[in-house]
């Protein structure tokens, strides 16, 4: 077996995107002879770090947690919102075994299918498109009685914006010819997370026994009456719609929120036999399903169970007897360890970690170099002593100084990074090692909002650089994403990628 160059260094320049526009672009403005030389002379290109390419909704800017998860996993790691949306688009949602089992059992017994959740397009806890899909699933599987218990938003959406969402679901039921909205209540009651059980009790009694403070003929009338009482969406009081509906033994109940924290309390009331927070008038025996896992302690199946990431890069390197070093300063240490390892806290066998403290300043524009020089000292030392097969480093400057919105400081941050990259490349050349230079998402390449002229402190959807430093004659293919980086590293290391890694090498 031929020996591969050692070490292979993955440099993650956090928040270092690429923009063709020179406007407010700290990367463009900075004096960066090393990166300019690499860009002109070695294999390089751009890869995507945002939207569906990293498991987020279309057009959504990337972030450090998601970026490092994708970089280390070697596959697109879909977030819960996106997992559900993608399953609906692909048609898989309508065959989901957990939901279908609950619905089919209820249908076979002539029972009702109830589903509940936050009815809005906020996309933080739920999405109305998911509720529409649930209505369609119940209809397709033969349910005659389909009831939506709608929780109104007004926090992740404007305070009085529920009318359009109600209209959408009313239209869905009308088109299906089956089903209706059975109740309305504000999320203040149904989605408490502070153990205010008096609020949760009102939601539970409304859903299970149809007991509302108010009854309205239609959901729209119920909403209008709430507004007339001075309530905004979040605080709409328990309102039963039409003939009050009850949840009976044998019914299916599906909670359609994908975010866990505000779904736990109401779920507990439905499924805990020894529940003691308030006295339930009834606890019907239902087929209860959560869209995701709300807590391990809640005895209910999840339609989209948490995916455990097997054979992430760190794990696979360990299985193949490779040594690795993870290094970052405080601000990004969790990203280069926990998130890069697919949500695992403990180091893998043969993995060592170095944490360099971030400087104690109020904001990093006051010290744009942060602790990058100290991080670089330790990497150069590790390269020279040849102890590790792989070194993964995060440089926090582009992101943390980018968030300050101070252009001059961001330029200094990029210039500092250029010096650090130069030192690492020089050390690698001495020992015959290799490097990949990339980023997790954009930020520092846009420091002002073009429309307002104000400081731009957020991430961007710009692509990020991908640079190969080494002696092999390789080319960078187009269309790469963050999930392709780990398979690229395995190719350089002479290792077959595991089946779980669906990314493909960027170097060809």
From Swiss-Prot:
CDD domains hit by this protein: iPGM (cd16010)
Cofactors (names): Mn(2+)
Gene Ontology cellular component list: cytosol
Pathway involvement of the protein, from the record: Carbohydrate degradation; glycolysis; pyruvate from D-glyceraldehyde 3-phosphate: step 3/5
Top-level EC class: isomerase
Binding site for Mn(2+) 2: 14, 64, 440-441
Cofactor note: Binds 2 manganese ions per subunit.
An annotated GO BP: glycolytic process
Pfam families noted in UniProt: iPGM_N, Metalloenzyme
Origin: domain of life: Bacteria
Reaction(s) this enzyme catalyzes, per UniProt: (2R)-2-phosphoglycerate = (2R)-3-phosphoglycerate
Gene Ontology MF terms: manganese ion binding; phosphoglycerate mutase activity
Binding site for Mn(2+) 1: 399, 403, 459
Disulfide bridge map: none
Record EC number: 5.4.2.12
Catalytic residues, chain numbering: 64
Keywords: Glycolysis, Isomerase, Manganese, Metal-binding
Residues annotated for substrate binding in this entry: 125, 155-156, 187, 193, 259-262, 332
InterPro entries on file: Alkaline_phosphatase_core_sf, BPG-indep_PGM_N, Metalloenzyme, PGAM_B_sf, Pgm_bpd_ind
PANTHER family per UniProt: 2,3-BISPHOSPHOGLYCERATE-INDEPENDENT PHOSPHOGLYCERATE MUTASE
Sequence similarity: Belongs to the BPG-independent phosphoglycerate mutase family.
Subunit field text: Monomer.
Function: Catalyzes the interconversion of 2-phosphoglycerate and 3-phosphoglycerate.
Name of the protein this chain belongs to: 2,3-bisphosphoglycerate-independent phosphoglycerate mutase
The encoding gene: gpmI
């Amino acid at each position: 077996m031929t020996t591969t160059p050692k070490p292979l260094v993955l440099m993650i320049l956090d928040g270092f995107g690429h923009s063709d526009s020179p406007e407010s672009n700290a990367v463009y403005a900075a004096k960066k002879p090393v990166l300019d030389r690499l860009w002109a002379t070695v294999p390089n290109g751009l890869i995507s770090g945002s939207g569906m390419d990293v498991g987020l909704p279309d057009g959504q800017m990337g972030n450090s947690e998601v970026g490092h998860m994708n970089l280390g996993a070697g596959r697109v790691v879909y977030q819960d919102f996106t997992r559900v949306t993608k399953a609906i688009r692909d048609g898989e949602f309508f065959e989901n075994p957990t939901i279908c089992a609950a619905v089919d059992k209820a249908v076979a017994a002539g029972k009702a299918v109830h589903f509940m959740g936050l009815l809005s397009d906020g996309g933080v806890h739920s999405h109305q498109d998911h509720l529409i899909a649930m209505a369609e699933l119940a209809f397709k599987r033969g349910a005659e009685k389909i009831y939506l218990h709608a929780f109104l938003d007004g926090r992740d959406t404007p305070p009085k914006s529920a009318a359009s969402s109600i209209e959408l679901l009313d239209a869905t039921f009308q088109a299906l010819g089956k089903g209706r909205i059975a109740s309305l209540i504000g999320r203040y009651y149904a989605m408490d997370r502070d153990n205010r059980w008096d609020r949760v009790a009102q939601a539970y009694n409304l859903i299970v026994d149809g007991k509302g403070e108010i009854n309205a003929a239609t959901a729209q009338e119920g909403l209008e009456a709430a507004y007339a009482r001075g309530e905004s969406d979040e605080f709409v009081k328990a309102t039963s719609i039409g003939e009050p509906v009850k949840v009976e033994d044998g019914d299916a109940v599906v909670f359609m929120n994908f975010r866990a924290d505000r779904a736990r309390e109401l779920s507990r009331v439905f499924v805990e036999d020894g529940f003691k927070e308030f006295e339930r008038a009834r606890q019907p025996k239902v087929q209860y399903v959560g869209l995701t896992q709300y807590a391990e302690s809640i005895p209910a199946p999840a339609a989209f169970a948490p995916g455990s990431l097997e054979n992430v890069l760190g794990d696979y390197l360990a299985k193949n007897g490779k040594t690795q070093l993870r290094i970052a300063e405080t601000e990004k240490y969790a990203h280069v360890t926990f998130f890069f390892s697919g949500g695992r806290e403990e180091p893998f066998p043969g993995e060592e970690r170095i944490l360099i403290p971030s400087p104690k300043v109020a904001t990093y524009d006051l010290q744009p170099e942060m602790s990058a020089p100290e991080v670089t000292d330790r990497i150069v030392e590790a390269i020279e002593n040849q102890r590790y097969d792989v070194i993964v480093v995060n440089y926090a400057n582009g992101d943390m100084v980018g968030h300050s919105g101070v252009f001059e400081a961001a330029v200094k941050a990029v210039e500092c990074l250029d010096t650090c990259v130069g030192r690492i490349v020089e050390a690698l050349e001495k020992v015959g090692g290799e490097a990949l230079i990339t980023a997790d998402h954009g930020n520092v390449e846009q420091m002002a909002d073009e429309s307002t002229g104000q400081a731009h402190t957020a991430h961007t959807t710009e692509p990020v650089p991908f640079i190969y430093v080494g002696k092999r004659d390789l080319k960078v293919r187009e269309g790469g994403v963050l999930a392709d980086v780990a398979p690229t590293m395995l190719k350089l290391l002479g290792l077959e990628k595991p089946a779980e890694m669906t990314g493909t090498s960027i170097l060809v």
